[in-house]
């Protein structure tokens, strides 16, 4: 945009650095990429996450809680990818900070987007650690991603079942009813 170029030129001149890189968002992708992904995840959490619903359904035991956190994070990422192409690029294009196999496996199930190449090994390990019934249950959760209460309740049940069946060495990190609208332009009943 011409206005952005003009502002950048003014900033370089005022900063006495006329040769400064005016295309920082492209030239420093290694640094800014993970930052963009983190910012997108924070925005998705603010828009689609209800702390009360999460707290009500979060399992008490540590193993189930860790699984629940992975599924919850995958749900938010999938919602972002489903509606916003730029978010998809940021989340899948700059994923290097975590090695959460269950999160990426669930992300694939919930969004229909394949995990990036550097995550495929941890996804394969997570998939191999789950029984066919657990894999089916994970796929079933995909239909609930837009309804936080139902998703959280079903995810908690899935985690309670899975926590005894998922080996510890599988890579992973550890209210009011409302529906998320079917389209990004819709209204969210939580927000009025």
Where in the sequence are the language-model features?
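Segments forming glycine/polar-rich beta-alpha architectures that bind adenosine-containing cofactors
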Residues: 162-192
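Basic/hydrophobic alpha-helical interface regions
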Residues: 1-159, 163, 169, 179
């Amino acid at each position: 945009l011409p206005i952005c170029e003009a502002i950048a030129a003014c900033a370089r001149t005022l900063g006495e650095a006329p040769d400064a890189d005016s295309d920082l968002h492209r030239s420093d992708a290694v640094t800014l990429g993970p930052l963009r992904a983190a910012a997108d995840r924070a925005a998705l959490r603010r828009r689609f996450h209800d702390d009360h619903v999460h707290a009500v359904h979060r399992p008490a035991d540590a193993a189930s809680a860790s699984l629940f956190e992975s599924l919850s994070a995958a749900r938010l990422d999938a919602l972002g990818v489903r509606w916003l192409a730029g978010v998809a690029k940021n989340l899948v294009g700059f994923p290097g900070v975590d090695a959460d196999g269950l999160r990426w496996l669930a992300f694939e199930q919930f969004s229909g987007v394949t995990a990036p190449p550097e995550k495929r090994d941890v996804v394969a390990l997570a998939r191999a650690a789950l029984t066919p019934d657990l894999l089916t249950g994970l796929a079933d959760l995909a239909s609930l991603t837009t309804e936080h209460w139902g998703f959280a309740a079903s995810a908690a049940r899935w985690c309670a079942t899975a926590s005894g069946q998922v080996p510890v060495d599988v890579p992973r990190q550890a209210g009011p009813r409302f529906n998320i609208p079917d389209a990004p332009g819709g209204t969210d009943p939580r927000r009025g």
